[in-house]
């Protein structure tokens, strides 16, 4: 949703987990019927989608653009699965080697949301990826 030239990492992980359970996952289209729509945005200033255009049973909004304290379900957060197929226009992989931060900057919510820096397991790479974009906030601060 944010349109900042990167795929939404949370949606990629959610899509992979839902597909692994046998659910059909696709981008929502107006006037189509859906049991559930998952929406995620990183920034509060990102305009919201008009969900009234959808025939949907439930809309679940997540990400720091909606709720600073919200978290992905633990099974999704701990999964290495990532569905790059929902973003075919991006020819790269996304990767984090740590989450959290060593600092407590007043303008940033990473430390509040993710805690102190800790190493995380790398996620699956894009099978069609030509390079890796490392989105690690503290790549050089991680002692491991």
Q: Positions of the model-derived regions?
A:
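A short, structured N-terminal alpha-helical element that caps or precedes a catalytic domain
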Residues: 1-58, 66-67, 141
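A cross-domain feature marking catalytic cores of carbohydrate-active enzymes
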Residues: 41, 63, 136
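Conserved Radical SAM active-site core
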Residues: 34-36, 46, 93-98, 102, ...
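Catalytic core of nucleotide-activated saccharide and alditol-phosphate transferases
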Residues: 54-114
């Amino acid at each position: 949703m944010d349109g900042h030239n990167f795929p939404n990492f949370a949606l990629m992980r959610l899509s992979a987990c839902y597909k692994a359970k046998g659910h059909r996952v696709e981008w929502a289209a107006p006037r189509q019927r859906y049991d559930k729509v998952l929406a995620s945005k990183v920034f509060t200033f990102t305009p919201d989608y008009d969900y009234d255009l959808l025939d949907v049973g439930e809309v679940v909004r997540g990400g720091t653009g909606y709720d600073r304290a919200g978290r992905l379900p633990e099974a999704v957060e701990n999964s290495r699965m990532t569905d790059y197929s929902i973003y075919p226009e991006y020819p790269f992989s996304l990767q984090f080697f740590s989450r959290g931060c060593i600092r407590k900057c007043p303008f940033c919510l990473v430390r509040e949301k993710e805690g102190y820096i800790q190493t995380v397991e790398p996620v699956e790479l894009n099978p069609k990826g030509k390079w890796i974009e490392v989105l690690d906030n503290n790549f050089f601060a991680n002692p491991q």
